[in-house]
């Protein structure tokens, strides 16, 4: 594993990254903006991590088949189900907000939804690495499976009488 940092850049955020990488004994290389641009097609904010294993990138993604086995073995309490999110910025923002709200997992349909891509990861600001994401073929069948696994399915709407913050969301809950 290596971290490439923009040479000559002096800001608190990059300094903290360099300190953490040093403590973790990760190689740190100062490089030019052109080298960073080359590695990222221009989207880097002055730092790039090169990981030796795709397992790190994919550890929070799972298939539909793995979903219910995972639920049997883990205490996932709050799931967010998103349908029709096609803009990667919107999915990234949803992931970031979900992470802050304590959501353990996000479920999206495979079709007509954006997948987890570099733009989503960037906008999610780390949430893509902490919130599990599952792409399913059939949302209705998935909801039925969640019910059979003891989840309460809670529908949300923009014009609901009560805010989501006024609801009792303890226990196994899936927000749609």
Regions found by a protein language model. Name each.
Residues 1-175:
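Post-transcriptional modification and biogenesis factors for structured RNAs
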């Amino acid at each position: 594993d290596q971290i490439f940092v923009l040479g000559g850049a002096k800001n608190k955020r990059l300094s903290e990254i360099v300190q953490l990488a040093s403590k973790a004994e990760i190689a740190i290389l100062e490089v030019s903006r052109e080298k960073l641009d080359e590695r990222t097609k221009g989207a880097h904010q002055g730092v790039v991590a090169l990981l030796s294993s795709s397992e790190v990138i994919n550890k929070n993604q799972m298939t539909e088949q793995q979903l219910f086995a995972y639920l049997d073995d883990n205490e996932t309490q709050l799931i967010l189900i998103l349908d029709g999110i096609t803009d990667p910025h919107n999915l990234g923002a949803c992931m970031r907000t979900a992470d802050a709200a304590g959501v353990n997992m996000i479920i999206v349909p495979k079709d007509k939804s954006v997948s987890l891509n570099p733009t989503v990861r960037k906008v999610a600001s780390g949430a893509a690495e902490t919130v599990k994401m599952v792409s399913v073929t059939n949302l209705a069948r998935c909801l039925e499976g969640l019910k059979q696994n003891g989840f309460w399915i809670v529908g949300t709407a923009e014009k609901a009488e009560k805010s989501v913050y006024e609801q009792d969301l303890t226990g196994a809950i899936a927000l749609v």
